Amino acid sequence: VIDYELPRAATLAAVPRWNNLDEAIAHWAATKPTESAYVEPAGRMSWVAYDQYISLLAAHITELGLERGAHVAIWIPDGCVVHVAMSACIRAGVVFTGIGARSGEREVRHLLARGEATTLITVPQIGRVDTVELFERLRADLPALRRYVDVYDVVPVPHGRVDAALDPATGAPVGAAAVASANQLIAGRRTPTDELALLNSTSGTTGLPKCVAHDERRWLKYHDYAVDAGALTTDEVCMSVVPAPFGFGLWTAH
């Protein structure tokens, strides 16, 4: 039997409720710009850097010619970058399927096919797998799969403290003008909270994962449940031990 004191209404009322994730990100980027949005072993990313990288990657996706509602897949090891990628897809108005970093070729192929992905957003190497070589093999059997995106071309792994988006080629801050240009390019593309935003890959009963369709409201509702059940405040620092971007890692980590 678990006995705990129910959180007081005043405590719950003090925790913001958001209409979408972008509202939360923009709020913390404005009010806590240098505080950490995400922390990983290699480094930490501030709220401002997180917000800027999301816009830059969303603009990059848009520049590739993907229409709103296009389907993509995210195959990126857990860490700051995968969270940027998920938010960037929503900001760019494309539907993403999350693929676990430990997935083998058969599972990746299955999820790309089931998710009808036209684009694979990934990193050059996952474990011992050269993702470019794998992409070339997969596209031979998946005619819809046409684009390979190296996320590190836009969003590098943070080393130490990152307080602003950096140019991966030079290591220098990209600057406000580049971010403003990215925001202008993606204006009006954001996926509405009540429309399909992602396909969550999770364990199936046939030896291959299944895909569960979600809109953005699933995060907002889960946030409310977590705040209410745990009497959480805005001072909490949350540790996720469930890998993203799939399964319960989507519920707890992002």
Say what each PLM segment does.
Residues 1-18:
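Flexible, non-catalytic linker and terminal segments flanking ANL/adenylate-forming cores
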Residues 13, 17, 26, 34-79, ...:
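Conserved AMP-binding/adenylate-forming core of the ANL superfamily
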Residues 16, 33-34, 166-201, 208, ...:
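Conserved pre-ATP/AMP-binding loop-to-beta segment of ANL
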Residues 25-26, 62, 80-99, 109, ...:
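Hydrophobic alpha-helical segments in the ANL/AMP-binding
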Residues 72, 89, 196, 202-205, ...:
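Conserved S/T- and glycine-rich ATP-binding loop of Class I adenylate-forming
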Residues 74, 229-254:
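Conserved AMP-binding loop of ANL adenylate-forming enzymes
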Residues 75, 120-121, 199, 241:
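Short hydrophobic segments within beta-strands
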Residues 92-169, 173:
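Structural core segment of the AMP-binding/adenylate-forming
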